[in-house]
Amino acid sequence: MVKKQFHVLDLFSGPGGLSLGFNTAKKASLSFKSVVANDNNLNASQTFSKNNPDVEFILGDISDTKIKKKIAKSVKEKTGNQGIDVIIGGPPCKGFSLTNKMTRNMDNPMNHLVMHYLDVIKTLKPKAFVMENVPGIFAMEKGKLVDYLIEEFKKMGYTNTTSWLLNAADFGVPQIRKRAFIVGSLNKTPIEKPKPTHDSQSH
């Protein structure tokens, strides 16, 4: 059986938590490998690069056009012009927090970075994407933000786009940690919501 390896671009990578999850997720016929990552935090970049020395890390603000061009160039070089398969990332979410009603609106600059994530997807056109955020994103603009993002992704061709609220405790993490996910694929096969592997009530 030929094994397919999907190339991954990690945006707003932080020290590399999402990349670690993808790089260790394997099935008989497929695997994932992060090839390019981006964040504007120096400490995060150093940690990421130490743990992933073969991944090209672009340090800089993704809202800067020059940084976006560097990301696109690196992806092209790393994938041999084949393009990126999957884009993952968790845009900074301070403004989306359910505990901070004053910042939970699109007038807050902290909330604009999610649009740059969308812009990179539109430019690089991966086969699939995964966006992670805090649960508060579902309350943003009374749910209109998530509806808007899903609609924009569908306009790009990701008609198979959905959103979930998942609890890390349901998947073996020893703490209750709920997170929002928006996932999309160019493939028309319906995306199934992950089934819990553990009982969160035991935490």
Language-model segments: what does each one mean?
Residues 85-88, 130:
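N-terminal Rossmann-like NAD(P) cofactor-binding module of classical short-chain dehydrogenase/reductase
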Residues 61-62, 67-75:
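Membrane-helix interface linkers and caps
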Residues 9-65:
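SAM cofactor-binding core of SAM-dependent methyltransferases
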Residues 73-81, 94, 98-203:
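Class I S-adenosyl-L-methionine
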Residues 91:
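Glycine-rich, N-terminal phosphate-binding loop of Rossmann-like dinucleotide-binding domains
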Residues 35-37, 57, 87, 161-165:
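Conserved beta-strand scaffold positions in the cores of enzyme catalytic domains, especially
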Residues 46, 65-68, 95-97, 139:
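Short active-site-adjacent helix-start/loop capping segments
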Residues 1-34, 152-155, 179-203:
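S-adenosyl-L-methionine-dependent DNA methyltransferase catalytic core
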